[in-house]
């Protein structure tokens, strides 16, 4: 919840900041999360 936080790149690295953003790959436009759990 809150893709704005994921855009920073934190959720991109796998940090538990935004599971939805990192899991969906919205937070990382160039590096989508390979793990569908945001972990």
UniProtKB/Swiss-Prot annotation:
Provide the tissue specificity: Expressed by the venom gland.
Annotated localization: Secreted
What Gene Ontology terms for biological process does this UniProt record contain? regulation of blood pressure; vasodilation
Identify the glycosylated residues: 35
Is Ligase given among the entry's keywords?
Answer: no
**An example molecular function term from Gene Ontology annotations:** toxin activity
Q: Which cysteines are joined by disulfide bonds?
A: 12-28
Please give the name of this protein: Natriuretic peptide TcNPa
Species of the source:
Tropidechis carinatus (Australian rough-scaled snake)
């Amino acid at each position: 919840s809150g893709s704005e936080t994921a855009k920073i790149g934190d959720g991109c690295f796998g940090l538990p900041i935004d599971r939805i953003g990192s899991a969906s790959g919205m937070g990382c436009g160039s590096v989508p999360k390979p793990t569908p759990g945001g972990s």
